[in-house]
């Protein structure tokens, strides 16, 4: 028997939220394969250095997100790890609260991975496209 959804029920998007310098950022959880305290992949990158070219990280990464390498077209699907400072959280946010980057800001963005924004507990969260991140 098919299940019927409540028309008032909003679609949710699972996000992994973390800090990058003074900002909070998020990746869609479907792109995060694992979350660990120590790097285990051959290829790693610090989120702050990766997103802010020429910026020295305030502190070394304390957590690691394992991501599928979008640049690698191998059968085994290579992975790499993104180092973040502080804790990360897995949260479900309503899809209608995720906003694309406005056209005027798009050419001025600091990273090609920046694709939108949302708010969590009245704090701005930068939405990143994991497929555009690479070490």
Predicted segments with their positions:
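An acidic, low-aromatic, low-complexity terminal/linker signal
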Residues: 1-135
């Amino acid at each position: 028997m098919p299940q019927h959804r409540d028309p008032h029920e909003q679609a949710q998007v699972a996000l992994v939220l973390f800090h990058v310098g003074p900002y909070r950022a998020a990746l869609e959880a479907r792109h995060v394969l694992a979350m660990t305290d120590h790097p285990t992949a051959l290829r790693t990158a610090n989120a702050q250095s990766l997103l802010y070219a020429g910026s020295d990280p305030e502190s070394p990464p304390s957590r690691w997100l394992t991501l599928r390498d979008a640049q690698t077209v191998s059968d085994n699907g290579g992975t790499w790890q993104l180092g973040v400072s502080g804790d990360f959280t897995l949260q479900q946010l309503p899809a209608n609260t995720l906003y694309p980057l406005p056209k005027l800001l798009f050419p001025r963005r600091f990273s090609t991975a920046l694709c939108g924004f949302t708010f969590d507990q009245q704090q701005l969260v930068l939405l990143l496209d994991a497929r555009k991140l690479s070490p």
